[in-house]
């Protein structure tokens, strides 16, 4: 909806081009913190750099927490109102309607995740021990625990992705090559560009991928991820009309995450570099962390907030902050 787009645009404008997060300094360089390169900085082996970047970014965002909260809550209230107008029992039911999924599936997912948090916590303990820390802080979660001085060029990324996706067959591989040759991917990072990676598609035109490429294996994996969406959109356009070509959000990540898994498995199977094999394995673990445990943590926050809004209660920045903090304590 237009309201949803406005919510996203306000957030992206603030995070990516308006807020100034300052700089972090090391013995080698001074680096400006942006919403795009923050995740790279947080992989630093220097804990002081990680802590400095974390405190500067989060404190700056905290200055505008009421604006972010009001923007989020306004969007959620609109979604809740539309669910009520359309006679859904809850907002969650309305959001799951197009996927034909009962909300009991979501409840079951959260229960299973919470029941198996010991697996995730065992991984966090491994990170803590690998870093030689007595206590693990939030800014330690993405610290590089492997010796990762490897750098990948765009051409390296294209080669690895091309080789890994040959497993799908000639048609799929040809579309991947077409995407590279016709420059479907925007790799560069610059001020104002959205952080992370995205794929967008308009019926009748080829998909476009936006990413922020810094030369790490994770960046190669991100390109593979978004190209999974791109090929999916491309083939779906060929097989469907413009009213039916879009896929359902519940299964949208299948095409993309499968590509990341295939890429990492390809490297593990074919590389002769032991460290690169470990980096690829580490990437697989991060996929589980980000797309299962972290996603469910954020989903629980959203679900709790929608329940209150559906019942006519008021939520604000303090509620959102305290709730995500309490949920994080359970997970971590």
What are these regions (language model features)?
Residues 91-171:
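A metal-dependent hydrolase signature that marks the N-terminal structural subdomain at the beginning
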Residues 140, 147-203, 216-217:
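Auxiliary, metal-adjacent structural segments of Zn-dependent hydrolase domains
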Residues 1-104, 108, 112-115, 163-164, ...:
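His/Asp/Glu-rich acidic catalytic environments and adjacent acidic regulatory segments
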Residues 233-254:
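Post-HEXXH active-site segment of zinc metalloproteases
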Residues 247-274, 290:
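Post-HExxH zinc-binding segment in Zn-dependent metallohydrolases
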Residues 330-332:
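Conserved small/polar residues in nucleotide/adenosyl-binding loops
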């Amino acid at each position: 909806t237009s309201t949803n787009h406005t919510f996203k645009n306000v957030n992206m404008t603030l995070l990516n081009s308006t807020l100034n997060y300052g700089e972090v300094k090391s013995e080698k360089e001074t680096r400006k913190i942006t919403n795009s390169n923050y995740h790279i900085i947080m992989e630093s082996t220097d804990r002081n750099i990680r802590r400095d970047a974390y405190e500067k970014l989060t404190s700056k965002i905290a200055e505008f927490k009421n604006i972010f909260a009001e923007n989020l809550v306004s969007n959620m209230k609109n979604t809740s109102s539309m669910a009520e107008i359309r006679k859904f029992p809850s907002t969650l039911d309305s959001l799951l309607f197009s996927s034909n999924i009962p909300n009991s599936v979501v409840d079951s997912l959260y229960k299973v995740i919470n029941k198996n948090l010991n697996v995730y916590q065992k991984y966090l303990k491994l990170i803590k021990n690998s870093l030689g820390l007595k206590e693990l802080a939030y800014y330690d979660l993405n610290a590089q625990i492997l010796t990762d001085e490897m750098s990948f060029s765009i051409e390296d990324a294209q080669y690895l992705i091309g080789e890994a996706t040959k497993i799908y067959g000639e048609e799929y591989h040809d579309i991947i090559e077409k995407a590279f040759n016709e420059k479907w991917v925007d790799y560069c990072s610059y001020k104002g560009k959205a952080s992370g990676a995205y794929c967008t598609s308009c019926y009748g035109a080829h998909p476009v991928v936006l990413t922020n490429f810094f030369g790490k294996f994770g960046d190669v994996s991100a390109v593979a991820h978004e190209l999974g969406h791109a090929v999916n959109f491309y083939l779906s356009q060929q097989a469907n009309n413009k009213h039916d070509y879009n896929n359902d959000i519940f299964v949208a990540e299948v095409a993309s995450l499968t590509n990341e898994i295939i890429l990492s498995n390809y490297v593990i199977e074919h590389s002769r570099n032991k460290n690169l094999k470990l980096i690829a394995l580490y990437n697989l673990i991060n996929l589980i962390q980000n797309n299962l445990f972290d996603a469910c943590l954020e989903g629980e926050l959203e679900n709790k907030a929608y329940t209150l809004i559906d019942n006519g209660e008021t939520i604000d920045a303090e509620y959102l902050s305290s709730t995500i903090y309490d949920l994080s304590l359970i997970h971590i």
